[in-house]
């Protein structure tokens, strides 16, 4: 990120100081000290340097205080190099661990950098102070920038979401999550602020009257909602006590068109009660502190301490003034459009809520009834709310309630009255809040423009753990659980699922962050029900309490892992839930009340009838059922997306909130989420302090580390092939050959051309995936490439424009010279008399003819005006008729609207009654079900009592059996003690032999613990026998009490049932009445519809007449416009002709004067004129022929071009059709490829499962071997068995050690060894179970005895006729007591043995703990090494990428050098060429200069001769008298001299012209030379500077590359050292593997002896494989058929979708027709045009309808084929089932053979056990392999049958879908037929529109032709005039010679006037001025 010198004050909180980070001193210090992170109790982690390594421990020196500490290797974490300090994206860290992440966040936080990227999301730490990073300047900095171009900021997140919404056309959401006080609300406000600036809807608009109104209101909505919904809590001074989802709608161009706010769960209980040091909602304090005196008197306000509902009085907020905030809130409401009356009404309601708290009730002396001794507060409440005081107090103290069908008054107690007032206050405030929200939404959504997409911002209460957590905290924490689960699912599950779906190489990583168990604990509906479901269930029962709810919750969810019962119970209403952020203790007191939210009906009806309109509006929709108040309408108005389901159902607060949350989660899942994780640094709300453990806990809970890890290891950026090719093909322009190419193949070629590292990307099925930062790098290169291309294009454009401007200047220069010459000629010509005469006479020639034409045109115009007036009168009449018809139509529509509204109200009432009836019926059914359950339970109790008598008879026998069992137990105890002593000795021996027998000790410990637990159980049972009798007696009494209660409840239920039946009959009668009313309304509606149809028919006739009239009017207007155009063209032609007439007249006058002057040369001049006229006519004819041929050629070229265009369009259509076919084929091939890939994956997984099960079976074979060898012996052979187990444990421990050595590379071996170890544990546990069977039987007998004793005691109290039997049992009990006393003595002995065993157990546990600690240490080392390996792999990838980037830069550098060399050589060549041209032009200039000098010399010589001749002529004239005789000769000589002089003049003029031209050329050459020289010098200088700059830049880059290479060498050296270490470990492992291989070879030698017996097994295996292959073949065929059926189904679905689209298009056309009909009332012309267009559309729709009918027939054929194929598949399934049964029989036969082989094997094992133990083990392994193969066959057979069942199911689903599609197609057909009638009406309109457009095009073409002809004729006239002028000039050259001759004397004698005239005429007709 570019830094611009010194950072400004606000940029210091955004940018990092790179000078400190890139310090080489810090880098060297880090490398020298070997810095690491070690755990710290204060700071979480502390920096230290490694001093010494001692095995598994490391001695480190703390950097802060220099203290040396010894820590474990597993506890230290690597430190990143200093260049990664304060890194902006933590995914760039080299060593990713908790310490590095915490350190980076801490460093940035202390530097004022609160935003940090963490992979794909952003982490924000609350600064607890104001930072200058939210100004308009910062907004402009982030506007339109990419993420990597600017530092982290909430503006960057908002801009990314905004740009993604516009580019991808996908809805976006920004989720700010975190604990309470972390800064979610503030960041939400910043997002809205940024969007209001960037996407302002008034940008670029001219209307400034509404500038930014919507944006202002959007920004001001937050202060209003915060004032009424936020409060101060312990953790946060501005805590949102409600959740909100702000949906900002944007149009297609990205402007804001509206917004909507949805709220969730306002904590309304805060309005009446607050915890210590907390406040209620802000508006209460704002109002009391900021209201003026008048307002205080109007609102009846008092001091803070005078209100009971303000529990803590006035609690100030630091840095906030309540009075100022009140003014801001009032201003915000004014901006939102709240009137002053509405504001005052709102504040009155707020004040009334406070006054409700001041109402005090007292208990009367003799009764519990409540009374109100002082009603002052009540009077204030009633004054503010507009209700009667007496009615209000009566409703509170003695409300009227309904008992059955009667209404009675019931006196309330003090507690009930207090509760009613508090409930009223809460409900009033909640309704006020919802009204404000509805009003705000109405203001924000008043534009009524359709939004193309939206951006949602979620701000919801954060996770809360208070001292007392109630129902609101449960809902808030439940919401946060759902949001965190969405984050985990989006970041971890969906990301990896897409990798697998695209088929890229990826191993699925389970991050263990599933929160579903906790969510199900709260929201699960049944089996078992969750917290909310149980709470709703308890709300049904009238006697339910909070304690019963908690008890039921503990019984249902007591075993749930996320549910806990607190150990130290303060109250019986407490329970705990383990959330993702920690354990929360909830107190369920008053939860039932909060969930039901009851209200007093009497008070709500009073408020509904209030005199205050605002209060009445708040309470207008009260609907109460079963004690719950309903606010359905208000909820719908505030939540536009909420559906109108179950208006009258029993709806609890929990249910409503759960549904709202479900809709919110659905909305979020449909958007692309952008996560912002807000972190709270400390709980003291202090800036500059960061609690490390608090931040770490939040990072762990939020999944920050896992998110960074998957961002680093995964491929977070992805792009589809077509978009990648379209966007980045400019970077590899020549890589893709011309012609069609598959998108994937093209991307592969582009990747090769771009030379990307293969580790940086993966190519999937439809997308290409990139690691972090790769796409950003490609974007930068693309921007640079586009910049270069644009610069080159701009240079070419500027060059072209400069050349064009230069040519234009040259043309202007020559034109200026011509104009100057002509102006000078005109100045001399204007005083010529003949010219003046010509200009006066010429305009008078055509005046008479033009006047006649003007008169005719005026007559025609008058007629046209009359016709237009007539048409206008007709149009006015038609408009009057139309207005009458529209009025009639409006009246009919109003009547129809009123009737439909009446019908809708009746329908709504019917629906509401039906819902109430349904609710009551459900309650009745539930009561009946409970009644039946109670009856069943009573019958069960009677049956149990009958069973007791029979069971009592068997009690004596069971007691005797128990005594025998006790004796057996004592014997077993003695034997067990002996065995335990032996085992103790053997354990000591084993400790001496090997110190790694921890596993066996664990097993022995479990065995001993089982024995001790059994002994303890026996002791407890012996003690409890004395208490059994009392217990059973109490149980019987409780059962009798419960039975009586059940009988009472049954009677109550019967009464309720009768009552409900009566209500149901009343409802039936009401429903019948309503149905009769509905029938009457329907009849009236039918009549009105008939009248409306008749009116519409009349309207159609009127419209047709109007259309005809409009058609005539349009024709007349067209005719008028044609005439007007003809008139204009005639006028223009007349003016043009007059102008031409004047010009020709002037020319004619000039010609006449010239002809008069040139009468001397008559014959020759006439001949020349005739010749010239003939030449002119010939030229005219040739010109006409040329124009005609040119027009013909143009016409032919147009026809050819049109034909070529048609051919190309046909070819294009063919190519499109071919492309569509290829796309379909490609899709089918891709589907087949995906299916094959899926099959391959399934087979691979099956193979892995088979291998895994093979290993398990091998372990089971070993287990069977040990069981077969050890199970046959008696328990006396325990010592031998222990020795065997010792050997096995030794082998296992050896394998474990080997696995620990291979921990880095052989993790799978560790898993297999642990599985083997688990098998041995299970084996030992099974043996202990066999030894303890007797004790379990004893426990069973005791349990049976207990149950019988219970039954006995119950019968003693229930029946008196069994007293004798009870006395005998008492005698038996006394005997049993004696026996128990005897047994107590044995128990004491057992206790002594127990103490001894406990000591042994303690020793064993100590040894076990040591072994477990060693194992944990090994696990830690393994994990640490694995993390180091992962870091090394990441470093290696980074280094590879760095090397590849360096190589690419080197290649680019070489390429740039080569280009620079080429450019410099090219410029050198250009310079040489320019110098050569300059030299040539200089030589030409010199030669021209010499020629000019020669011409000047010749001119001077001619002038001298001329002067001499003049002198001679003067002499001759003067001597005329003397030589009169020689006059004739003198005249001849004079004429000769004059001709010579004339020739000399012409030569002189020609020489002067040439001289002028050479001078001009010389000047141009000099100017061009100077310009070229200057440009060349500037280019050379710029090129030198550019080369110098590039050289310096390249030197800097080389220096940077050298430093980077040096770093890379160091890192490579470290990697090489690690590699050497790993290679050493590998060599050790290879040595161990060699020893294992030698042992394996020895086993193989012994195995070869028994290979003959294996051949039989192999044959059977081959048979089984053949049968399996047959099954697979048949299954594949079935799958192919199913795929073909699926393809047919897909085709049918596509056809159906096409029909659906056609239907939707028809609907759209229908709506457009309706709109056009409405618009026809104002403009008839548009309706006529639209009519013709729509008629053509109707024809097209008819054709599409016919095509759809054909498609439907084809679809029915396909359905028939599908049914036939389904029957065929069912037959094949039957055959497959038969083959499967055969395979099953074969498998059973193989299993029997396998059992026989096992028995043979056991026999062989008994025979040769002592000698060939190893060979038997090998045989058993082989047998296990065969068993595994057999089981594999069985599994494959099961998979085949499963796949067949799946195919069956798919086939049925396909048939059902086909049937549904057939029905839908029929519906579409009916809709299309209905649309035909409307569609035919539109066909005529489109034809008329086409005729109109053709006529307009014809007129346009006609005018274009006339214009072309006029311009051609004008050009021809101009050419003719020029030709005449040139002829006239040539004629004057000869005609003026005599005049000069005759005027020669005048030239000599007279003054200079005549000479000037001659010169003027010469200049005029020759074009150049002769001067003497």
Swiss-Prot record:
GO terms for biological process: actomyosin structure organization; cardiac muscle cell development; elastic fiber assembly; skeletal muscle myosin thick filament assembly; smooth muscle contraction. GO terms for molecular function: actin filament binding; ATP binding; calmodulin binding; microfilament motor activity; structural constituent of muscle. It is linked to A chromosomal aberration involving MYH11 is found in acute myeloid leukemia of M4EO subtype. Pericentric inversion inv(16)(p13;q22). The inversion produces a fusion protein consisting of the 165 N-terminal residues of CBF-beta (PEPB2) and the tail region of MYH11. Aortic aneurysm, familial thoracic 4: A disease characterized by permanent dilation of the thoracic aorta usually due to degenerative changes in the aortic wall. It is primarily associated with a characteristic histologic appearance known as 'medial necrosis' or 'Erdheim cystic medial necrosis' in which there is degeneration and fragmentation of elastic fibers, loss of smooth muscle cells, and an accumulation of basophilic ground substance. Residues 858-882, 1744-1800, 1866-1972 are annotated as: Disordered. The modification Phosphothreonine is found at residues 1177, 1958. The modification Phosphoserine is found at residues 8, 23, 40, 1684, 1722, 1954, 1971. Muscle myosin is a hexameric protein that consists of 2 heavy chain subunits (MHC), 2 alkali light chain subunits (MLC) and 2 regulatory light chain subunits (MLC-2). This is Myosin-11. GO terms for cellular component: cytoplasm; cytosol; extracellular exosome; melanosome; muscle myosin complex; myosin filament; myosin II complex. The gene is MYH11. It holds the Pfam family Myosin_tail_1. ATP binds at residues 178-185. Keywords: Actin-binding, Aortic aneurysm, ATP-binding, Calmodulin-binding, Chromosomal rearrangement, Coiled coil, Disease variant, Methylation, Motor protein, Muscle protein, Myosin, Nucleotide-binding, Phosphoprotein, Proto-oncogene, Thick filament. Residues 85-783 form the Myosin motor domain. Belongs to the TRAFAC class myosin-kinesin ATPase superfamily. Myosin family.
